[in-house]
A protein has these predicted regions:
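A polyanion-binding, active-site-adjacent surface
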Residues: 3-232
């Protein structure tokens, strides 16, 4: 694989783009070493695309948000390229259009991390912070990255509702919030009330595949946000 062949020629950390990046609470360090497979994949991407972000993607949004959106992981040409969750790929188009419709955005989304877009009342994060091969993190990688999700959710003092995009995000978020999976099965539109903490709402992931196949439609996705607003 081209990524694997190039990984030994990655630029050293001090030559990477965004050398002054400093992670905030709940974000992974730029050269996080916890998952060897993801580190190797990340290094290969740095060698092939030295101007891309190619690092754990930090959360994005309002630090006083009442709504959090938990995705799966960065896409190779989306967040892994731009350094902002859901920015630069198909899933971001639907997500940010929906956030805008429901009044969560300031500025205009233009698929770039420097487009001036802001979020008001909402925050976006991922279950896994690094881009995984074939968009499929392993169970061990999901578990290893979960402490960052736990810490990120704890940094949001006004959090009332979390929307989980897809089954993996659902499972990791349930565990991050201290819930038990058998009591909280995934299903689009399912609402999960845990003993403490925010309410969790499930949604199919807003991926190109799900929208092209009709598994997720725009009205279905918007209904999830309507439910979130009703639970605020």
């Amino acid at each position: 694989m081209e990524i694997d062949a190039a990984r030994d020629h990655a630029l050293p950390p001090d030559q990477q783009p965004w050398p002054n990046y400093r992670p905030q609470p709940g974000d992974a360090p730029r050269d996080c070493p916890r998952c060897p497979r993801l580190v190797a994949f990340r290094d290969g991407a740095r060698a092939l695309h030295p101007d891309w972000w190619n690092a754990p993607v930090p959360g994005f949004g309002d630090p006083y948000a009442w709504l959090a959106i938990s995705g799966l992981a960065p896409g190779m040409q989306g967040a892994n390229r731009t350094g902002r969750p859901f920015t630069g790929d198909w899933a971001g188009l639907l997500l940010f259009d929906t956030l805008s419709k429901f009044g969560f955005t300031t500025g205009t989304y233009d698929a770039r991390s420097d487009d001036g877009l802001g979020l008001c009342g909402a925050f976006i994060t991922n279950a896994v912070r690094c881009v995984p091969p074939q968009n499929k993190p392993s169970p061990v990688e999901i578990q290893t990255c979960r402490p960052f999700l736990v810490d990120r959710l704890k940094t949001l003092p006004n959090l009332r509702v979390v929307i989980a995009l897809g089954q993996i995000a659902h499972q990791s978020t349930i565990k991050a919030l201290g819930g038990k999976l058998p009591k909280h099965p995934f299903g689009h539109g399912n609402v999960h009330r845990l003993h403490t903490g925010p309410v969790l709402i499930d949604s199919y992931h807003c991926s190109r595949y799900n929208t092209n196949t009709g598994r997720l439609t725009v009205p279905m996705f918007e209904a999830v946000f309507e439910a979130a607003l009703a639970l605020r």
